[in-house]
């Protein structure tokens, strides 16, 4: 005679196994989605660049989150001493607060890009909100004299469906990067220096943050002569992008 308790036990074990499988698949999917959303080198669609394929030893040096009245001028001085031009992806609200610093970046011959107005994660925002973040910053940059194409870099490198859709509609390039020393972890300059020099390749886009403090400045002072000694030249993002086939 069939034991109903044993049958029930087997059924529950089957349910438990299927439930565990669902949890595992959901967990893997969530991790994959998070990696996709926050990837600094990949975007689902649209025109984007994280590195340019080239045999020439050229790199683009980029700075996010400025302008900052204390640290951005120090970064500019370090770049001036090496005669190097970079690209600064600025937050609109910081341009609004410190327009003179933004103009100084431009006066010294550097490129300026758009890093949104308020630095939100644009992943789950409506298309209208995303467009407002971009267009509001565009206007502020035009007001200080920026001309030509204004490239865009997603805050937190976060993007999924909505942001690429908006950028496609606006015919805008999304600038990511393949060299990230993870400044947010508060590493010391020697650690970040080693990380950058290990990751860099011809056509790389290096990501730093000009509002960060002394460790970022020391890292910059380390990598510029080191990369120059290795035969690298520095270009703006626009110059590097023109090398794409």
Range-by-range predicted roles:
Residues 25, 66, 91-93, 117, ...:
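Active-site beta-loop-alpha junctions enriched in small/polar residues
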Residues 37-129, 133-140, 148-149, 214, ...:
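Active-site beta->alpha N-cap acidic-glycine motif
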Residues 1-62, 73, 77-87, 198-245:
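Terminal accessory/targeting
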Residues 151-154, 244:
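Cyclic nucleotide signaling catalytic output domains
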Residues 60, 113-116, 175-181, 204-209:
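Short beta-strands and strand-loop turn motifs
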Residues 123-146, 163-175, 193-196:
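Soluble catalytic domains of enzymes that build or remodel membrane lipids, polysaccharides, and related
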Residues 158-199, 232-243:
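His/Asp/Glu-enriched short active-site or ligand-binding loop at hydrolase and phosphoryl-transfer sites
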Residues 73-74, 100, 125, 162-165, ...:
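Generic recognition of short, well-ordered alpha-helical segments
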């Amino acid at each position: 005679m069939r034991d109903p308790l044993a049958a029930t036990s087997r059924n529950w074990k089957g349910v438990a196994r299927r439930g565990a499988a669902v949890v595992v698949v959901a967990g893997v999917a969530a991790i994959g989605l998070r990696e996709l959303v926050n990837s600094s080198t990949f975007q689902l669609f649209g025109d984007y660049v994280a590195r340019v394929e080239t045999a020439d030893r050229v790199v683009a040096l980029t700075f996010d989150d400025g302008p900052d009245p204390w640290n951005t001028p120090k970064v500019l001085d370090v770049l001036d001493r090496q005669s190097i031009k970079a690209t600064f992806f600025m937050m609109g609200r910081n341009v609004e607060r410190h327009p003179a610093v933004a103009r100084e970046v431009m006066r010294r011959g550097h490129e300026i890009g758009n890093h949104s107005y308020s630095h939100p994660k644009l992943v789950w925002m409506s298309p209208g909100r995303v467009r407002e973040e971009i267009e509001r910053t565009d206007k502020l940059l035009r007001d200080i004299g920026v001309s030509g194409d204004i490239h865009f870099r997603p805050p937190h490198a976060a993007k999924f469906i909505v942001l690429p859709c908006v950028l496609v509609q606006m015919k805008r390039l999304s600038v990511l990067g393949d060299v990230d020393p993870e400044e947010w972890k508060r590493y010391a300059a020697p650690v970040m220096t080693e990380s950058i020099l290990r990751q860099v390749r011809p056509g790389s886009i290096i990501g730093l943050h000009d509002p960060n403090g002394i460790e970022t400045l020391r890292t910059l002072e380390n990598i510029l002569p080191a990369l120059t000694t290795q035969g690298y030249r520095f270009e703006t993002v626009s110059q590097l992008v023109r090398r794409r086939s």
